[in-house]
Swiss-Prot record:
<feature type="binding site">
    <location>
        <position position="113"/>
    </location>
    <ligand>
        <name>anthranilate 1</name>
    </ligand>
</feature>
<dbReference type="GO" id="GO:0004048">
    <property type="term" value="F:anthranilate phosphoribosyltransferase activity"/>
</dbReference>
<feature type="binding site">
    <location>
        <position position="228"/>
    </location>
    <ligand>
        <name>Mg(2+) 1</name>
    </ligand>
</feature>
<keyword id="KW-0028">Amino-acid biosynthesis</keyword>
<keyword id="KW-0057">Aromatic amino acid biosynthesis</keyword>
<protein>
    <recommendedName>
        <fullName>Anthranilate phosphoribosyltransferase</fullName>
        <ecNumber>2.4.2.18</ecNumber>
    </recommendedName>
</protein>
<dbReference type="GO" id="GO:0000162">
    <property type="term" value="P:L-tryptophan biosynthetic process"/>
</dbReference>
<feature type="binding site">
    <location>
        <begin position="92"/>
        <end position="95"/>
    </location>
    <ligand>
        <name>5-phospho-alpha-D-ribose 1-diphosphate</name>
    </ligand>
</feature>
<comment type="subunit">
    <text>Homodimer.</text>
</comment>
<keyword id="KW-0328">Glycosyltransferase</keyword>
<comment type="similarity">
    <text>Belongs to the anthranilate phosphoribosyltransferase family.</text>
</comment>
<comment type="pathway">
    <text>Amino-acid biosynthesis; L-tryptophan biosynthesis; L-tryptophan from chorismate: step 2/5.</text>
</comment>
<dbReference type="Pfam" id="PF00591">
    <property type="entry name" value="Glycos_transf_3"/>
</dbReference>
<keyword id="KW-0460">Magnesium</keyword>
<feature type="binding site">
    <location>
        <position position="90"/>
    </location>
    <ligand>
        <name>5-phospho-alpha-D-ribose 1-diphosphate</name>
    </ligand>
</feature>
<dbReference type="InterPro" id="IPR035902">
    <property type="entry name" value="Nuc_phospho_transferase"/>
</dbReference>
<dbReference type="GO" id="GO:0005829">
    <property type="term" value="C:cytosol"/>
</dbReference>
Length: 336
């Protein structure tokens, strides 16, 4: 038993928080294969029962970043990866928004995986749309540079995550690893729109982003529990801008968007969700388009492309109506 895991389990058994340096060391021990399955399970369960701190989340992310593959990216790159886990069954809102954001001129390094909530993750829907999940890091760099968007499949860039797959599966509960995806972008995206599935995660993830040196980001959770900027009502959000953290509320009706029901946003199988995304990019109007505009507009504000969400929504609408967003999809398909 390593010193780090012994000390960590001792502290967790007393419901005490782990110091950042100790957390970083114990994750390194985990990644190097020095921990037994029982120790890994105890660590993850202990953190979950105690409640993970922003410092613990950031230390996990820093250790995993060091173990993952990386790509070079333009300075203004953004990611729309969220935590998932809201179990809402909506279509792939942030993935669809990624095409719109890229069409508006902000490079998007979309980090994602197969489904974590609902029935369809970003990888599942992009695969249905004809985008290769097997792009090499070199190809992804080219896509980002010349097309303005790429998909970074988490399984390719973070093979070390496989070291805890069995323990996570056998525990069967949410663990700290469910929070890490948005913090592990291989392109090091300095801008983010990060949806979380619970109001309790909002300040934690915002603080973790601040610790990790995020340039500017918006963390959001809908009052309906959606891990997106929602269209059914208000969204609680936090803007991280360098060293500052600023809470605010997003109300769709203030931007001329009609409220809808969760039923209006429902998705289905990967094939069905792919069709929803395609129809939006082809110009279909309605609540599905509107929630994509709202999320893309918020992301463009986070990326400093727009002075506010209202201007961001206008830029997002132009991206869709001009065909630029659809063109991003077509170029990515052609490069597969």
């Amino acid at each position: 038993m390593t010193y780090a895991i012994h000390e960590s389990l001792t502290l967790l058994s007393q419901k005490q928080n782990l110091p950042e340096e100790l957390t970083f060391t114990v994750v390194q021990d985990l990644l190097s294969g020095e921990l037994t399955p029982a120790q890994i399970g105890g660590l993850l369960l202990g953190l979950s029962l105690k409640g993970e701190t922003p410092e613990e989340i950031a230390a996990f992310a820093q250790a995993l970043r060091g173990a993952g593959l990386k790509i070079k990216a333009p300075a203004g790159t953004l990611d729309t990866c969220g935590t998932g886990g809201d179990r809402s069954g909506t279509f792939n809102i942030s993935t669809t928004a990624a095409f719109v954001i890229a069409g508006a001129g902000v490079p998007v390094a979309k980090h994602g995986n197969r489904f974590a909530s609902g029935r369809c993750g970003s990888a599942d829907v992009l695969e249905q749309l004809g985008i290769s999940l097997k792009a090499t890091p070199e190809s992804s760099e080219r896509h980002l540079q010349h097309i303005g968007m790429t998909f970074l499949f988490a399984q390719v860039y973070h093979p070390a995550m496989a070291k805890v797959a069995r323990e996570r599966r056998e525990l069967g509960i949410r663990t700290i690893f469910n929070l890490l995806g948005p913090l592990l972008n291989p392109a090091g995206a300095p801008y983010q729109l990060l949806g979380v599935s619970s109001p309790s995660l909002l300040p934690k993830m915002a603080k973790a982003l601040q610790i990790l040196g995020s340039k500017r980001a918006v963390v959001a959770v809908g009052e309906d529990g959606l891990d997106e900027v929602t269209l059914t009502g208000a969204t609680q959000a936090i803007l991280i801008d360098g060293g500052a953290i600023q809470p605010f509320i997003i109300r769709p009706e203030e931007y001329g968007l009609n409220l809808c029901s969760l039923q209006d946003l429902q998705g289905g199988t990967p094939a069905e969700n792919g069709q929803i995304t395609l129809r939006i990019l082809q110009g279909k109007k309605g609540p599905q388009r509107d929630i994509v505009l709202l999320n893309a507009g918020t992301a463009l504000y986070a990326a400093n492309k727009a002075a506010g969400i209202r201007e961001g929504i206008a830029l997002a609408a132009e991206s869709l109506d001009s065909g630029k967003a659809l063109s991003i999809l077509e170029k990515l398909k052609a490069s597969a």
